[in-house]
Amino acid sequence: MEWSLSQNKLLAFHRLMRTDKPIGALLLLWPTLWALWVASPGVPPLWILAVFVAGVWLMRAAGCVVNDYADRKFDGHVKRTARRPLPSGDVTEKEARTLFIVLVLLSFLLVLTLNTMTILLSVAALALAWVYPFMKRYTHLPQVVLGAAFGWSIPMAFSAVSESLPLSCWLMFLANILWAVAYDTQYAMVDRDDDVKIGIKSTAILFGENDRLIIGILQVAVLALMGAVGWLNGLGWEYYWSLFVAAGLFGWQQKLIFNRERDNCFKAFMNNNYVGLVLFLGLAMSYL
């Protein structure tokens, strides 16, 4: 019986960290890989690559824990989130806090193997991960903070490889923020009605009937900024083809969200994994 209870607890931690739902980690991973490949260029040091890949999964898990901790009193009122480990009682608040600390410490131990500049930048990464979940109570733009949190691995990657933060770094960082606002607005469109009832703020609520138009403008801006990154770094035709494919994927997402149906909005959000993958493949092939 004790083993069974222990197994149930581990499964609850597994759900709390969303290790069963890798989409968030992948949306964090792709910009990290973009930055490592551009900063290297094309040949990131193996240890630095390993540190960042592991760090992505650890910090995404930590972000999920603190997000659910911040939303623990709201999630029980939303059908999609009512069975999450904290509102359901499968994980206690103390256990969630402990798990968050363990995940952050493991991430920091990895960062300590990198240079001083990257270690200092990691402090901002922790601050963004902690602050983001609470922003949806105070501002309709929490997705901007999410974009900064998901994109902070970009300056960290440039710092770890070259100890510099060139213009390409900041253009890519801005592109990632705009991309995150676009895809997380699609995600927020799924819960918009519930969020209005319980007082949670989001860009989906802020944009209202202009949501599809603004998402489209953001997507065009992402492509333009990533095109500028390619131009600054002399990337080849492979990369520009990947931008063309990404534009097609964005077009497909616009079709999915056209009627604002919950399931299709979620499919549009999930489709962004392919955008990140396609851009990475274009970058990688351009450096071959």
Curated annotation (Swiss-Prot):
Gene Ontology molecular function: 4-hydroxybenzoate polyprenyltransferase activity
A single GO cellular-component term on record: plasma membrane
Q: What is its EC number?
A: 2.5.1.39
Q: Which reaction does it catalyse?
A: all-trans-octaprenyl diphosphate + 4-hydroxybenzoate = 4-hydroxy-3-(all-trans-octaprenyl)benzoate + diphosphate
Q: In which pathway does it act?
A: Cofactor biosynthesis; ubiquinone biosynthesis
Can you say where in the cell this protein is located? Answer: Cell inner membrane
Q: Which PROSITE patterns match?
A: UBIA
- Describe the function of this protein: Catalyzes the prenylation of para-hydroxybenzoate (PHB) with an all-trans polyprenyl group. Mediates the second step in the final reaction sequence of ubiquinone-8 (UQ-8) biosynthesis, which is the condensation of the polyisoprenoid side chain with PHB, generating the first membrane-bound Q intermediate 3-octaprenyl-4-hydroxybenzoate.
Task: Tell me which Gene3D superfamilies the record gives.
Answer: UbiA prenyltransferase
Q: Which family does it belong to?
A: Belongs to the UbiA prenyltransferase family.
> What is the phylogenetic placement of the source species in the record?
Bacteria, Pseudomonadati, Pseudomonadota, Gammaproteobacteria, Enterobacterales
Which Pfam families does the UniProt record give?
UbiA
Q: What is this protein called?
A: 4-hydroxybenzoate octaprenyltransferase
Note the topology in the membrane.
Multi-pass membrane protein
| Key words, A-Z | Cell inner membrane, Cell membrane, Magnesium, Membrane, Transferase, Transmembrane, Transmembrane helix, Ubiquinone biosynthesis
What are the TM regions of this chain, as residue ranges? 33-53, 99-119, 163-183, 213-233, 234-254, 268-288
In which domain of life is the source organism classified?
Bacteria
Question: What cofactor does this one take?
Answer: Mg(2+)
Single Gene Ontology BP annotation? ubiquinone biosynthetic process
